[in-house]
């Protein structure tokens, strides 16, 4: 079991119970899932780019990504409906906790010119979204084998009812928010 999951059960639940005066432990917000999305718009011209992006996402998450397809045709971007334009992975359970642990302790500190994550990236319902400009911050990616630096979106979905609860949950995990 991931250390972060044990830490959540032992420390974070108690801390949030006292902070928000919950009656039951089931009211305490928890991390539901983490979604990693990598948009590869250049895949229209070269299908190999999408395969490389999928391989990177597999290395980062430990799970085979789902290839996302265009929902509708857009002439300006030269895409048609059904064209493969990206890939995504949804992490739950043990893999989710392990990824969150690696993200907080290893990947985020390796971001170039890092001054903290924005605390304003909550959606109003306690879910947090962040963008990463380079996939090479993850230790699983071999820098020499990278064909192109790609970014990815990371969405942390929680059971929190408000942004304050979601922010308190992630802050309890020592998320490096900007002051």
From Swiss-Prot:
Keyword Ribonucleoprotein set for record: yes
GO molecular function, one term: structural constituent of ribosome
Keywords: Ribonucleoprotein, Ribosomal protein, RNA-binding, rRNA-binding, tRNA-binding
SUPFAM superfamilies per record: RL5-like (SSF55282)
GO cellular component entries: ribonucleoprotein complex; ribosome
Keyword Chloroplast on entry: no
Any single biological process term in GO: translation
The protein's role, per its UniProt record: This is one of the proteins that bind and probably mediate the attachment of the 5S RNA into the large ribosomal subunit, where it forms part of the central protuberance. In the 70S ribosome it contacts protein S13 of the 30S subunit (bridge B1b), connecting the 2 subunits; this bridge is implicated in subunit movement. Contacts the P site tRNA; the 5S rRNA and some of its associated proteins might help stabilize positioning of ribosome-bound tRNAs.
Record text on subunit structure and interactions: Part of the 50S ribosomal subunit; part of the 5S rRNA/L5/L18/L25 subcomplex. Contacts the 5S rRNA and the P site tRNA. Forms a bridge to the 30S subunit in the 70S ribosome.
UniProt xrefs under NCBIfam families: PRK00010.1 (NF000585)
Family, as annotated: Belongs to the universal ribosomal protein uL5 family.
Name used for this protein in its record: Large ribosomal subunit protein uL5
Organism field: Pectobacterium atrosepticum (strain SCRI 1043 / ATCC BAA-672) (Erwinia carotovora subsp. atroseptica)
Gene field: rplE
């Amino acid at each position: 079991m991931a250390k972060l999951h044990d830490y959540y059960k032992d420390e974070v639940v108690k801390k949030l119970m006292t902070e928000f005066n919950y009656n039951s432990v089931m009211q305490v917000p928890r991390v539901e899932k983490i979604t990693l999305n990598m948009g590869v718009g250049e895949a229209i011209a070269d299908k190999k780019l999408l395969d490389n992006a999928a391989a990177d996402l597999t290395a980062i998450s430990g799970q085979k990504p789902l290839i996302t397809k265009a929902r509708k045709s857009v002439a300006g971007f030269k895409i048609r409906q059904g064209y493969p334009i990206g890939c995504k992975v949804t992490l739950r359970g043990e893999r989710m906790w392990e990824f969150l642990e690696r993200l907080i302790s290893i990947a985020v500190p390796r971001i170039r010119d890092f001054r903290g994550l924005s605390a304003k990236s909550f959606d109003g319902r306690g879910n947090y979204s962040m963008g990463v400009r380079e996939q090479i911050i993850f230790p699983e990616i071999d820098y020499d084998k990278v064909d192109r630096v790609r970014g990815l979106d990371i969405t942390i979905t929680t059971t929190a009812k408000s942004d304050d609860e979601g922010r308190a949950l992630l802050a309890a995990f020592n998320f490096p928010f900007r002051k």
